Amino acid sequence: MAATTASCISFSQFQRLKKLIDSPASKHKPMEFKGTSKDDLEDDLNSFFDCEEELFLSANKIFYSKLRVYQTVRHWSLKQNWSSMSLDQKRNFILHCHHELSSGELLRNSALYSILYIAAGAYDSVGSFEEHVHSISENVYLLREFDIPKTVYSLFIEWNRTRKHSFLDNSRDEGFLNLLLSLMFFFLTLNNTDKTWIHSIRSLNPPVLPTLVKLFIDITSDYQLNLDKVIHSSLKKLSFLIFKVCIRLWGSQSYLQEKKAGLAEVLNISTSQQKPKTTALDYEVFRHEMATKFSSFADSYYPVPLDREQAHILPTLNTDSFHKSSFISSTRLCSPENPSLLVNTAKTSKMSARREQFQTNQNLPFCFTPNLEKLTIPYSVTEAANVFQNKTKRTLAVEQLLSERELLRRFTLQQRLVADLHEFYNSVKGPAHSFETEDPVLKFVSQSYDDLFPYMDNFIQLAVQLFYHISKKVNCLYVEAFSSSDAVLQRIQDNAVVDSPTEELSEQAARNRKSNVKIEYTEDFATGFAISGEISHSINNLEFVLYSLSSLFLMMLKWFRLSHVLRFERLAFLLYENHFLEIFNRHLTEGDCNRNTEKDVKCVRGGFFSYSSKMYKYDRVSIPVITRASSSRNLLITMNCLRVLEKVCKYSNIRKEIIARSNLHENLKKLLAIPHDKLRLYALKVLKLSVPFLGLKWKQANMSIITQIYLNCSLDLRDSWMFHENGSDTYRSAQLQETFLAILIRFYHIRLYGKKCKSLYQFCILEEMRLKKSIEELAASNMMEYIPESLWSYSFERSDTGFFENEFAAMHINDIA
């Protein structure tokens, strides 16, 4: 039974919940459920897990009886189930609940519980999975007819506005919040193709996403990362609900891929698949060559070309000749009057001179002062330029970075103000989201980013801290669970002996090794050991928060990059600055737990579920494994973290080098031993980033890993990805790249949000100090010109949001028109 977006909760999961409620497990009795990890694994971002219904429908008899309140107290003496009621009776009942929502507090909660039971599909009155899915769709549609979702959201906004600072200490307020979050979950979980309904949810005021994020920040700050409270609080519901809101209002993974494909077709129209495409750098070189003869080509031309390897990184990398000049302007570079480059007077060989000339032509910024005289351009040159532009391989990120970099350059140098001030002012004050306004989904994503911008820094900081503390707690709980079972301890010891060349194999271990059974499904590396109900409940709740946060990070990175690349770079920078890389590496390593486990059970556990590969890959036939749903969550958590890590470090040499220095590659090698194709692929992609910065001895000793990277990862035909340039030059290039990109990110946000950036200064004090020091060092070494602090500093005083009007006033320019 595959997990789909339409089946928000599977029928089998409801049956397990009902079984749990009817016959609750003892506190110290092992909990065994038939997991659905294989079904859940089929859809990454839209998968649903065994504890999801336990998350939004508390597994206890009191809550269950409240869900059935309409049958006992308010059923108008009708002795029939919900499924057997007529459509008019259902509508009258929902209308009655709608009236009660606006009445006193005594009846409001009972009406909300009844609506929650209806929205959950009335699972105790249906007999099959198909009936359950149909019941959910029908009931939610009826609730929408009477605007029940909007009414519930208005109650949530009213409660959020009037809540006290210490509302978590009040069990009544916390229970009411859990009830409202559960209702919002069921209303947003059901997949709906009705554009009117989606538009109504997007147009709610205040918006849903920033409201939930602000509540998440308040709850996390109040709890102060007390994990004992997190387990029993509404924070786990809230974190998953934020992720679910992003899916429903932005789009799922499949919809994201369709949107990316559509944008690619728009940007590469009239291109031929039989002929090779040129790069953006080739087109810039062509424009420079033409501009030396025909100045009209220099009108809207970008002075800094893009690098061939990483097309959206600015400025170029690994070029010593580039470092000897500024990337914004330089008087010694070529011009239309004198297009020849400076010739080195030092005696060099013919081959080295030719190589130096080629490198200079490919990487030197072609900056020059355009000739204002209008010359006639031959038709053949214009036609060649159009064909070349159509054959140029471009991406949305390249176009956005080129545009933003041109604005920064023009405003920094104050060029063309006298010649054509009105045109320059319109370009600077143009539409903020010129690349995504044509698409309604990207426009809404941009609006969501605008709403989230004041809370983004604080939210990412608290979310990453919460991820760290929860992952550390989960590892400790797993070690405690290992230590609580003597039988499992013996099994681990036997399997640890299998990998040891010095110890003798037991009969059971030898027989298991001889069978050499291949693992095919996710259930085979489930954490199949007997644990108490208390530990199982804690692990399920904590892992659910880990899955929600990792999925949310991945979803935001993907959609923000599609809307604007600088939003993606800002989020990636926040994750990097809050040490997500180190936290993930520590979670895989977990030094203290590793030593304890190795001492007790002779098995080094690599974190998450990598220990399962050593535990169960030999004894699947002889000893039955108790499957648990958390194994699929662990699998998806790991893949999400690997994908987030790859996106954060993919375009930064400094971050790639940190991966190599942190010995993360040793933990990734352990993940390659787990027989799962997707997990191996994402682990290989992260390993590919760190390979150039690893030593030659490591490469020679791990040629099998490099071979797997060649076979599974998309690479160019050359082998340059395995090696990096000269160490000092690479570091200087990376430093220049990081500094310029940070300036560009800040310039973009200051241009759009103006005075709002002032409130973020307290979160960016250290960042601004480091950036200011880097700019001064690069300017002193003539690697770049000093950029005014008003263009990138959040602490710069601005009287109003009209930032550029103030800058024009400072230059004594009053009449823009």
Curated annotation (Swiss-Prot):
Coiled-coil segments: none
Record's subcellular location: Vacuole
Keyword Transmembrane attached: no
Residue numbers of Phosphoserine PTMs: 500
Gene Ontology CC annotations of this record: cytosol; FAR/SIN/STRIPAK complex; fungal-type vacuole; mitotic spindle pole body; nuclear envelope; old mitotic spindle pole body
One of the GO biological process terms: negative regulation of septation initiation signaling
One Pfam family cited in the UniProt record for this chain: DUF3402
Primary location recorded for the protein, binned into one broad class: other
Functional description taken from the UniProt entry: Participates in the control of the reentry into the cell cycle following pheromone treatment.
Assigned protein family: Belongs to the FAR11 family.
PANTHER family (UniProt xref): AT25231P, PROTEIN REQUIRED FOR HYPHAL ANASTOMOSIS HAM-2
Protein name in UniProt: Factor arrest protein 11
Species of provenance: Schizosaccharomyces pombe (strain 972 / ATCC 24843)
